[in-house]
Curated annotation (Swiss-Prot):
This is Aldehyde dehydrogenase family 2 member C4. It is found in: Cytoplasm, Cytosol. Involved in ferulic acid and sinapic acid biosynthesis by oxidation of conyferylaldehyde and sinapaldehyde, respectively. Can oxidize L-lactaldehyde. Possesses activity on acetaldehyde and glycolaldehyde in vitro. Homotetramer. It catalyses: an aldehyde + NAD(+) + H2O = a carboxylate + NADH + 2 H(+). Belongs to the aldehyde dehydrogenase family. GO terms for cellular component: cytosol. The gene is ALDH2C4. PROSITE patterns: ALDEHYDE_DEHYDR_CYS, ALDEHYDE_DEHYDR_GLU. NAD(+) binds at G245, S246, T247, D248, V249, G250.
């Protein structure tokens, strides 16, 4: 290991790139324009595949296929039980191809192969199984009408054609969190994966065909946000768009939806999540969770605990332990089983993170460890910790989306809560303490969609997550996610001579 980087030795065979075309109406086809774009291996900056570049014309074709499949096809007309069987078959095929999918996400996005193999891809299959289990349990309710002459009930119906726009940081899990509930609800869809990480989405399209998902239910248009993504957001025949990504892009999608057909919009956006470490926390565990919360997935995670607040009684000890442990946080080839952090997703993100690190230095924060790129090939960055960060600094305010931690001190519980809420975001937060009354007070006071107590990244298939404030307007995972793809219809009729009400 040199400068905190593993040697990258691996015996894993790299994946064969089999699918690079658009997937529309059950077929892999070239883009109408014939255009393609290159996808880059972030380990070395080299081209690994040339992928079809879809734009508005291709989105039109995909939406037409999805519309026909919804209006005339079998998918929304199947019983939930029948849909569930096909979705479970899809999950079976995902599990049979775990290694291949994990390899694709590793070479495409720099994700650790072991993480993909044992976490991301199994969780992807899990989301499809969870929603398959929900597909035959979608129902309305009988209403207790206030007017005795009326009988009413509600129906839950699929919303229609959905545009799902997927981010690059978790290309498999985010694919599943949107596609699985949409399928279970009976929707058809057009999916645009991030241009940086399109390979696994195309492989999932292939598996959906093998599973027997009817043509037109799942369509994949690879391409860029400014063209393909914008066409989905503004399309007059798309009934709903779901997006995970930056707050700035989410705002543009909402504007496009409003300017077109007022389609429903679900947004899961940026974060600048706080981790509050109180005086009674276990110092060793606190340091481990702080590093995990900030550096997991190379910091490219919307709920990263990038702002760490430590109560003054244990601040010095926590800082010492953080610096000590950060130096053992190995960075290297994602196929190296000893690596804990791979390369950033692409050159643009790599340069953005390094720019923020320079801002931190120039604005007066104290660099405790890291702060540099590693090597002269690929997009590797040292885990970086700043102390003496103040609320007016860019590294405090902005979502960096990289392995950069801002470390601050606080005195009282009230001050800690105020610091935690001092952000435009509200996606997640962590609390480390043994005091149940304090935990209850702080967890109720922080304005965030999910709070982790004495743990971090406590995700579960049944547990919804999403944002307050500028972190979004929806919840994903759990039964709440299914509601994103359903709409409620009320049916009312006269009722005469009822024996009781």
């Amino acid at each position: 290991m040199e400068n905190g980087k593993c040697n990258g030795a691996t015996t894993v065979k790299l994946p064969e790139i089999k699918f690079t075309k658009l997937f529309i109406n059950g077929q892999f086809i070239d883009a109408a324009s014939g255009k393609t774009f290159e996808t880059i291996d972030p380990r070395n900056g080299e081209v690994i595949a040339t992928i079809a570049e879809g734009d508005k014309e291709d989105v039109d074709l995909a939406v037409n296929a999805a519309r026909y499949a919804f209006d005339h096809g079998p998918w929304p007309r199947m019983t939930g039980f029948e849909r569930a069987k096909l979705i479970n078959k899809f999950a079976d095929l995902i599990e049979e191809n775990i290694e291949e999918l994990a390899k694709l996400d590793a070479v495409d996005g720099g994700k650790l192969f072991q993480l993909g193999k044992y976490a991301d891809i199994p969780a992807t299959a899990g989301h499809f199984r969870y929603n398959a289990g929900a597909a035959d349990k979608i129902h309305g309710e009988t209403l207790k009408m206030t007017r005795q002459s009326l009988f009413g009930y509600t129906l839950k119906e699929p919303i229609g054609v959905v545009g799902n726009i997927i981010p690059w940081n978790f290309p498999s899990i985010m694919f599943a969190t949107k596609v699985a509930p949409a399928m279970a609800a009976g929707c058809t869809m057009v999916v645009k994966p991030a241009e940086q990480t399109s390979l696994s989405a195309l492989f999932y399209a292939h598996l959906s065909k093998e599973a027997g998902i009817p043509d037109g239910v799942l369509n994949i248009v690879t391409g860029f946000g400014s063209t393909a993504g914008a066409a989905i957001a503004s399309h007059m025949d798309v009934d709903k768009v779901s997006f995970t990504g930056s707050t700035d892009v989410g705002r543009k999608i909402m504007q496009a939806a409003a300017a077109s057909n007022l389609k429903k919009v679900s947004l899961e956006l940026g974060g600048k999540s706080p981790l509050l470490i109180f005086n009674d926390a276990d110092i060793d565990k606190a340091a481990d969770l702080a590093l995990l919360g900030c550096f997991y997935n190379k910091g490219e995670i919307c709920v990263a605990s990038s702002r760490v607040f430590v109560q003054e009684g244990i601040y010095d000890k926590v800082v010492e332990k953080l610096v000590e442990k950060a130096k053992d946080w190995t960075v290297g080839d994602p196929f190296d089983s000893t690596a804990r952090q791979g390369p950033q997703v692409d050159k643009r993100q790599f340069e953005k993170i390094l720019s923020y690190i320079e801002h931190g230095k120039n604005e007066g924060a104290t660099l405790l460890t890291g702060g540099k790129a590693i090597g002269d090939k690929g997009y590797f960055i040292q885990p970086t910790i700043f102390a003496d960060v103040t609320e007016d600094m860019k590294i405090y305010q902005d979502e960096i989306f990289g392995p950069v931690m801002s470390l601050m001190k606080f005195k009282t519980v009230e001050e800690g809560i105020k610091c935690a809420n001092n952000t435009k975001y509200g996606l997640a937060a962590g609390i480390l303490s043994q005091d149940i009354d304090l935990i209850n007070t702080v967890s109720r006071s922080i304005k965030a969609g999910i709070i982790w107590v004495n743990c971090y990244f406590g995700f579960d298939l049944d547990c919804p997550y999403g944002g307050y404030k500028m972190s979004g307007n929806c919840r994903e995972s759990g039964m709440d996610a299914l509601d994103n793809y359903l709409q409620t219809k009320s049916v009312v009729m006269p009722l005469h001579n009822s024996p009781w009400m």
